Amino acid sequence: MCQNKINTNNTMTIKSNKKLSYSVKKLLQKIFKQQQRVEEEQNLKNALKANSLESLESMENSRNADLESASICASLESCENEANERLSQSCEIEDYDFEQLPTVPVHFVRTAHGTFFWTAVSDLPADNDLVEPLYCSTSNAIAIPQDRWVQA
């Protein structure tokens, strides 16, 4: 009888231990599952943030690519080329005889303070700058020397 009681006590203890370990195991599983869910949610949020940043970057890249695309650049270049062609067609290029144009001598001197340039128009004959010098009365005055200088 004692043996039966001990066996019964042992089986009850084993059953209670099994129940206790089972409940602890269930509790730990719930805790681990909850922790896993929290981590998965955080990973999902982080992935969404990364995707949104990547999508923003890809949108910006595609926008820049569109701006640099050949169609836009080509249209701008074609507009510019057309404007240049129209301008060149509207302007008639005339051949100038440079022998008739008076030359203005440019003098220069290099010093420790820099290089100085100046022009002297005293070499021009009287009334040479007039359109029709015969009809103007300037008494054939000699041009006043107008020296201009600049430091380079």
Swiss-Prot record:
One of its GO terms (molecular function) is ubiquitin protein ligase binding. One of its GO terms (biological process) is Notch signaling pathway. It holds the Pfam family ESM4. Keywords: Coiled coil, Developmental protein, Differentiation, Neurogenesis, Notch signaling pathway. Residues 23-61 form a coiled coil. Signal peptide: none annotated. InterPro entries: Malpha/m4/m2. Part of the Notch signaling pathway. Belongs to the M4-like protein family. This is Enhancer of split m4 protein. The gene is E(spl)m4-BFM.
